[in-house]
């Protein structure tokens, strides 16, 4: 008689975690950071149609890495959740914390009850109401439903260690938009493999066509989300020489 296959609950959870982490690590990285006027999203994403960064509600933004079809389902569900709550109660009742909790419950349920976990990691960003001094808030939600709040920046997907190191070395809370873009792009350039025909010592260069950039701008009265592309983005990108310089003083363009 053939003995049935047995795996302990701990082993099953470890296998699911490993599957999800590997899937997330295969993707390109995303950096979300707070700056002087709100929240900046910078994703390495050559696609013009399949977005990693999007608007959720008036003052809420969304960023994700992993399997596109999975985080797109989560994004759309989040928009429906926010719209229904805002319509049923008040637009001010739609908060980043409520959406982050909803995402955490959904991902936690999928991780424990479904045959395969979602291979995604997401960030919900929130800025205060127009005219308020409420600081921006970032919520990171992982594949197993774990949730953490951040005040400065979040790095997700790909090879995160060199990106996190670069961000920690140069990040400052009151960066202007251009400095924040240069910092995030410079950090992303350190996170991927060296281009073919170059050595690992030579940094990558990410141009406008390889980036998806957006902001939650606290100076906008209602819908704070805005994409930055084309010539507006190109003017903000760091030059190759600038990425090799030491981190500048506050107000200058960081590497």
Curated annotation (Swiss-Prot):
The gene is prcA2. GO terms for molecular function: endopeptidase activity; threonine-type endopeptidase activity. The lineage of its organism: Bacteria, Bacillati, Actinomycetota, Actinomycetes, Mycobacteriales. Gene3D superfamilies: Glutamine Phosphoribosylpyrophosphate, subunit 1, domain 1. The N-terminus is blocked. Its main location: cytoplasm. It is found in: Cytoplasm. This is Proteasome subunit alpha 2. Belongs to the peptidase T1A family. It comes from Rhodococcus erythropolis (Arthrobacter picolinophilus). Component of the proteasome core, a large protease complex with broad specificity involved in protein degradation. The R.erythropolis proteasomes are able to cleave oligopeptides after Tyr, Phe and Leu, very poorly after Arg but not after Glu. Thus, displays chymotrypsin-like activity, low trypsin-like activity but no caspase-like activity. Pathway: Protein degradation; proteasomal Pup-dependent pathway. The 20S proteasome core is composed of 14 alpha and 14 beta subunits that assemble into four stacked heptameric rings, resulting in a barrel-shaped structure. The two inner rings, each composed of seven catalytic beta subunits, are sandwiched by two outer rings, each composed of seven alpha subunits. All four combinations of alpha- and beta-subunits (beta2-alpha1, beta2-alpha2, beta1-alpha2 and beta1-alpha1) yield fully assembled and proteolytically active proteasomes. The catalytic chamber with the active sites is on the inside of the barrel. Pfam families: Proteasome. Residues 229-255 are annotated as: Disordered. The keyword Cytoplasm applies. Coiled coil: none annotated. HAMAP family: Proteasome_A_B. The formation of the proteasomal ATPase ARC-20S proteasome complex, likely via the docking of the C-termini of ARC into the intersubunit pockets in the alpha-rings, may trigger opening of the gate for substrate entry. Interconversion between the open-gate and close-gate conformations leads to a dynamic regulation of the 20S proteasome proteolysis activity. GO terms for biological process: modification-dependent protein catabolic process; proteasomal protein catabolic process. One of its GO terms (cellular component) is proteasome core complex, alpha-subunit complex.
């Amino acid at each position: 008689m053939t003995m049935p296959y047995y795996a302990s609950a701990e082993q099953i959870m470890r296998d699911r975690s490993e599957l999800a982490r590997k899937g997330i690590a295969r993707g390109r990285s995303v950096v979300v950071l707070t700056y002087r006027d709100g929240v900046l999203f910078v994703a390495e994403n050559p696609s013009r149609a399949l977005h990693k960064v999007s608007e959720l509600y008036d003052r809420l933004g969304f960023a994700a890495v992993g399997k596109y079809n999975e985080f797109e389902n989560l994004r759309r569900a989040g928009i429906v959740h926010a719209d229904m709550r805002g319509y049923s109660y008040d637009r001010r009742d739609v908060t980043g914390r409520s959406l982050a909790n909803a995402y955490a419950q959904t991902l936690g349920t999928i991780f424990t009850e479904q045959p395969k976990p979602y291979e995604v990691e997401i960030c919900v960003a929130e800025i205060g109401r127009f005219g308020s001094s409420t600081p921006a808030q970032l919520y990171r939600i992982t594949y197993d439903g774990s949730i953490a709040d951040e005040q400065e920046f979040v790095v997700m997907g790909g090879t995160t260690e060199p990106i996190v190191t670069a961000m920690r070395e140069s990040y400052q809370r009151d960066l202007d938009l251009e400095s924040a873009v240069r910092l995030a792009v410079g950090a992303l350039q350190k996170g991927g493999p060296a281009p073919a025909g170059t050595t690992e010592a030579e940094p990558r260069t990410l141009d406008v066509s390889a980036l998806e950039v957006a902001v939650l701008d606290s100076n906008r009265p209602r819908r704070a989300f805005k994409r930055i592309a084309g010539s507006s983005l190109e003017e903000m990108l760091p030059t190759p020489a600038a990425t090799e310089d030491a981190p500048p003083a506050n107000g200058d363009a960081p590497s």
